[in-house]
Structures are given as C-alpha cells and as structure tokens.
Amino acid sequence: MIPVDALLKAYREGFFPMADASDGQLYWCRPEMRALFPLESYRPSRDVLRLQRRGEYSVFFDSDFEAVIRACAAPRKDDPETWISGEIVETYIRIHELGLAHSVECRYRGELAGGLYGIAIGGAFFGESMFYRRSYASQVALWHLVCHLRLKGYLMLDAQIMNPHLRRLGAVEVPHDEYMRLLEAALRKKTAFL
C-alpha cells in the first residue's frame, strides 16, 4: 500500500500515481500539460441534460466507493490494460475510509451503471477514473460532481492527463506552471466535500 502521507504530499506537489499495466509497478506522474474541467463554465451534453430531466439515473455520493474503484480498475472491452493496480485500489479504499477519497455512483433501477472516484484536498478535487455500464452514466456522474463542487466552493477539478474522451467532455489543458498556481490557490481553500 502507498503510505497515505506520501500520497497526499505528492498530490499537493502536482504528482499522482499510476501503475504499469504490464507488471503493476507504481510510478509518479506530473505531466507538462494538465487536463482540467473548468468548473465555472462546464456544460454537459444535451443527452446528459435530457437524461437528467427524465430522471433516468439516481446519483449518490460515497454510497459504494469500493464497487466504483474496482469497476474503474476492471479491464474494458476497448482497452484490456489498466493503470489501476491492486496496490492503488487498496490505498484509495484506505484514503476513502479516512474521508479524503470520494465516489459518485450513478444507478439505473438500483444497479450501479457508472461512476467516478477521486481525492478531495482543500478546494481541489483530483478525478482519478470513471466507468460506465450504461450509456452516459459516467457523464451523468461527472455532471453531478461538477454541480456539487460548485456548490461547495471548490476551485479545481483536475482530470490529470488529456485524452480524446476528456476533451469531448469539455476538459481543457493548462501548462504545468499555470496548473501549479491554480493548485496552490485551491489547496489554501478549506472546503468540506460532504
């Protein structure tokens, strides 16, 4: 297990852990360009808003953290490799027990349909991973997270490494120096997640 103090210190310094998919070896990432969701201007797709209006999904916070992280760590049809090792899973479950890691669960007729998890420190939320089993479930979870973070006064939603999916969802990239300025401001803010 990753020592909790070391993990939290790493986040405060702009690092986050990943595991090599081939052997589970842990390494620390601090990309030169960082993906963020702009909390003040983020808008979900029309499809997500339509699903919201219809009440198709029920959304919860921290109702089943372990199920969410294990679903995120599971191999996917389009990508059988995962960067979420058993060591990462166990560490984040422990951090959740300490009240610092959180999940958003999206349920369809009571069944877990999608969700996401991450870590909250000060006014920053570090989104780690998301998954879905039904269309748009992870995007509904993301929209609820953004609304919740706005309500609580968070300043940052870190999506870490840009990819085409995050870009389609509305993430933007900022250079490392700008990211660190934003992070320092967010860490100074005292904000409860729940």
Swiss-Prot record:
E.C. number(s) listed in UniProt: 2.3.2.6
Pfam families in the record: Leu_Phe_trans
Organism: Chlorobium luteolum (strain DSM 273 / BCRC 81028 / 2530)
Single biological process term from Gene Ontology: protein catabolic process
Catalytic reaction list: N-terminal L-lysyl-[protein] + L-leucyl-tRNA(Leu) = N-terminal L-leucyl-L-lysyl-[protein] + tRNA(Leu) + H(+); N-terminal L-arginyl-[protein] + L-leucyl-tRNA(Leu) = N-terminal L-leucyl-L-arginyl-[protein] + tRNA(Leu) + H(+); L-phenylalanyl-tRNA(Phe) + an N-terminal L-alpha-aminoacyl-[protein] = an N-terminal L-phenylalanyl-L-alpha-aminoacyl-[protein] + tRNA(Phe)
Keyword field: Acyltransferase, Cytoplasm, Transferase
Superkingdom of the source species: Bacteria
Name of this protein: Leucyl/phenylalanyl-tRNA--protein transferase
GO cellular component, one term: cytoplasm
Family of this protein: Belongs to the L/F-transferase family.
Coiled coil region boundaries: none
InterPro entries per the UniProt record, alphabetical: Acyl_CoA_acyltransferase (IPR016181), Leu/Phe-tRNA_Trfase (IPR004616), Leu/Phe-tRNA_Trfase_C (IPR042203)
Keyword Acyltransferase: yes
Its job: Functions in the N-end rule pathway of protein degradation where it conjugates Leu, Phe and, less efficiently, Met from aminoacyl-tRNAs to the N-termini of proteins containing an N-terminal arginine or lysine.
Broad class of enzyme this protein falls into: transferase
MF term (GO), any: leucyl-tRNA--protein transferase activity
Subcellular compartments: Cytoplasm
SUPFAM superfamilies, per the entry: Acyl-CoA N-acyltransferases (Nat) (SSF55729)
